[in-house]
Design a protein with these regions (language model features):
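Short, internal strand/loop/helix patches
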Residues: 103-147
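Short active-site neighborhood of thiol/selenol oxidoreductases, capturing the structured segment around
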Residues: 43-71
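Thiol-based oxidoreductase modules, predominantly thioredoxin-like and allied folds used
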Residues: 83-97, 112-121
Length: 147
């Protein structure tokens, strides 16, 4: 039994190590400037705080609210340490996720979560920097489309 577990662990770390080495040169992230839900410019590198960055959209039925709840719980568990963190929510649906709606929505989870938006091109550029993929279905149906 112990040997079986050790075998599985060895395989896991071998595969994990390979994936890390394979992706070692892949650059993910980088600086950006978007607008927050108060219409102020937010530059990622303007603060020395650690960042938790989450891409999502307000009409997301399950994964986005569940993840925002996890971020909120993490901030509560960190207590005073949470002052050293900027939790950031970047919308991938800037047409529908207007700043006032985003501010109201995020306040249900935690007032410290910073909601960011921009033009469709700006959001796409930042998403590409972070290797985030999203798409729209039925975009021609005004506000009745899926992300």
């Amino acid at each position: 039994m112990k040997i079986n577990i050790l075998n599985k662990l060895a395989r896991f770390f071998l595969i994990f190590g390979f994936l890390l080495a394979y992706n070692a040169n892949a650059e993910i992230g980088g600086d950006f400037t978007l607008k927050d839900y108060n219409n102020n410019k937010y530059n990622l590198y303007s603060s020395s705080k650690e960042k938790i960055i989450f891409f999502g959209f307000l009409n997301c039925p399950d994964i986005c609210p569940a993840t925002l709840s996890e971020v909120s719980n993490l901030l509560k568990k960190l207590r005073g340490l949470s002052k050293r963190i900027d939790p950031i929510f970047i919308t991938v649906d800037p047409e529908r996720d207007k700043p006032d709606l985003m501010k109201n929505y995020l306040s249900f989870f935690d007032e410290r979560i910073i909601g960011l938006t921009g033009s469709q091109d700006q959001i796409e550029k930042v998403a590409n920097q972070y290797h985030v993929y999203y798409s729209y279905q039925d975009k021609g149906k005004k506000d009745n489309y899926t992300v």
